[in-house]
Amino acid sequence: MQASSAAAAAACSAIKPAAHQHTVQVQEDKRGSEFRARFGTRKLSWGGKLSVENSALHQCQSLTRSIRRQKRQHSPVLQVRCYAIAGDQHESIATEFEEICKEVPQKLGAFYRFCRPHTIFGTIIGITSVSLLPMRSLDDFTMKALWGFLEALSSSLCMNIYVVGLNQLYDIQIDKVNKPSLPLASGEFSVATGAVLVLTSLIMSIAIGIRSKSAPLLCALFISFFLGSAYSVDAPLLRWKRNAFLAASCILFVRAVLVQLAFFAHMQQHVLKRPLAPTKSVVFATLFMCCFSSVIALFKDIPDIDGDRHFGVESLSVRLGPERVYWLCINILLTAYGAAILAGASSTNLCQMIITVFGHGLLAFALWQRAQHCDVENKAWITSFYMFIWKLFYAEYFLIPFVQ
């Protein structure tokens, strides 16, 4: 009996700690449930004070793995979309580049026509030829002489662009009839673009002239500016191109007098620092170019007779008729070539005499031969003949240095 009581007591004592431990476990589970309910955590399989922290870390890792799975699932789609966007951008850039490649040559071609290239070539050849006249020996060909020549040439080219550009700005309606291929008349350049080009050319020309500190060069530039503006600008007492005499006088004075005397003085007096003493070559060039410039001034109006007549420009071609003006120009040139042959024959240098006599004789013969097949009523033919006269103009400057 006593043994039974002792066994029962031992069992009770063993059950009490187990019950107590169970009670503690239940309380911890309850507190853990409340904590998880409050903070959204999940109880792990083990207890302890780090269970909450470990549970939160586990959730973060689970979220990271979930995001990675979503990325892996959507990455092919994203890559396809990125490739599509990149492809569209590449095609857009390629299209823009092709458009630019097409537009740049067109704009350059329009600018080339805007500058009136036959006048540009005349300026380059004329100034180059006249700048060589003061040179007496190879010792004169220095870097200073080259720099002075480049100052004269660059400023003159800019002034040339100003003059021809200003004329186009004021002749847009006339050029739509006479010269529809010009960029302002055809619409390739806007009026604003033309104005910017004209103003920029003027500023550059004057700036180069001022920087050179050459009185002859500045004089030539300012006179060219005044005469070029008076020729084209439609204002009271201006627009001299309406009058045949004033129009011819503007072209003659610039092409014949200014180019020969001013640029000769610039090279001899300002660059080479020598006293101004005109030579036989520069006197001959001035007189001969007076004839040639008069012909250019008269002949250029023959192809433009329709537009000039329509807009009230009283050119000599409008007043006398194109055929009479045509033969007047031919006779003036032939007379000038005859005088040039006599001037060349008076040279004491045999080589120079041969070059000037035969050179001018050959040019006169070419002019006469082509003039016999005239078709004044054909605008394309008369325009082509006008360009031929400019070629004779260029050729003359190659002969002028041999007239000594």
UniProtKB/Swiss-Prot annotation:
Pathway: Cofactor biosynthesis; tocopherol biosynthesis. Its EC number is 2.5.1.116. Signal peptide: none annotated. One of its GO terms (molecular function) is homogentisate geranylgeranyltransferase activity. It is a multi-pass membrane protein. Keywords: Chloroplast, Membrane, Plastid, Transferase, Transit peptide, Transmembrane, Transmembrane helix. Residues 1-81 form a transit peptide. GO terms for biological process: vitamin E biosynthetic process. InterPro entries: AtHST-like, UbiA_prenyltransferase, UbiA_sf. Its main location: plastid. The chain crosses the membrane at residues 114-134, 146-166, 190-210, 217-237, 244-264, 282-302, 325-345, 348-368, 380-400. It holds the Pfam family UbiA. GO terms for cellular component: chloroplast membrane. It is found in: Plastid, Chloroplast membrane. It catalyses: homogentisate + (2E,6E,10E)-geranylgeranyl diphosphate + H(+) = 6-geranylgeranyl-2-methylbenzene-1,4-diol + CO2 + diphosphate. Seeds of most monocots are enriched in tocotrienols and contain only small amounts of tocopherols. Involved in the synthesis of tocotrienol (vitamin E). Catalyzes the condensation of homogentisate and geranylgeranyl diphosphate to form 2-methyl-6-geranylgeranylbenzoquinol. Possesses low activity with phytyl diphosphate as substrate. Tocotrienols functions to limit lipid peroxidation during seed germination. Belongs to the UbiA prenyltransferase family. This is Homogentisate geranylgeranyltransferase, chloroplastic. It comes from Oryza sativa subsp. japonica.
